[in-house]
Amino acid sequence: MAIDRRRFLQLCAGAGALGLTPGRAAAYTPSPKLPIIDVHLHAYPADEALPTTPNPINGKSSVPKDGEGHLRACLAEMKRLNVVKGVVSGGSGDRLAAAAHWREAAPDRIIAGAGVRGSEDTPLPELGVLRNELAAGRLRVLGEVTAQYAGLSLSDPKYEPYLALAEELDVPVALHTGTGPPGISFDPCCRHFRASLGNPALVEEALNRHPKLRLNIMHGGWPYLEETISMLFHYPQVYTDLGAIDWLLPRAEFHAYLAALMRPGFGKRIMLGTDQMFWPDAIGIAVEGADSARFLTSSEKRDIFHGNAARFFRLGTG
């Protein structure tokens, strides 16, 4: 959910704004401690001052003072939870540089992605620069692509050369889908945002133009359940992550949505993502959200926590 984070905080920092249930305050450690790949993390420029708004779920003032402190706190939380790999994209400022800084700080743990949008205030990166970074392996994912916040879908011609590049280099794409903060389209940052543009079905033309493209539908496509199921059913190269919905939604709603994705047999295509934004402790809340789903077998949890992402990102295991 890579948007104007400060505006996100203004819009829905209070738990009531999203119908959330505060109070999940205890530090969480999964038991047994399964290896985890978090496919949805965000980085901020090292010298960027971060807001002090409490975590909207547990009420804790857990935001580090700047991007560098945020990096260190997130890496510590990843180590504590046995998050062996994390896919990170920039959330503000120079997004490519922010992700690269994380990779340089923990090259064995971090996979850097190219956070891109395509709006007037956040233009797409120069294609040649992106090609060089992807070809060299310094960036390994095209995403998070926040087309919805630019008033576009992934099938818009603006993204065509970038998708062609990803297909050519066999680089996976991670697309923001689903929802955004309440009232976001009224804010100057995101006047072109439309809820309807979060519909995962809008990727269909792009997928047919690029049949070899691997695509992660981020945020589980919530609340577009039927459309997400349709894309997973018709396009075997499509996976989905649970970022943000596994800690910001009420637990009962998240579990119901996850169960609905599991019932048609997509347990091998769902990946753990957190979308921690400013709050390092959100990583643990998100992991707990998936781990506490009692309808999941231990094998299904291993797939969601690690195996599916290892396969999607071609990490050599899973």
Walk through the language-model features, giving the residues of each.
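Non-transmembrane alpha-helical segments in soluble domains
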Residues: 9, 75, 87, 100, ...
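Mid-domain alpha/beta scaffold segments of enzyme catalytic cores
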Residues: 22-23, 28-153, 157-160, 165, ...
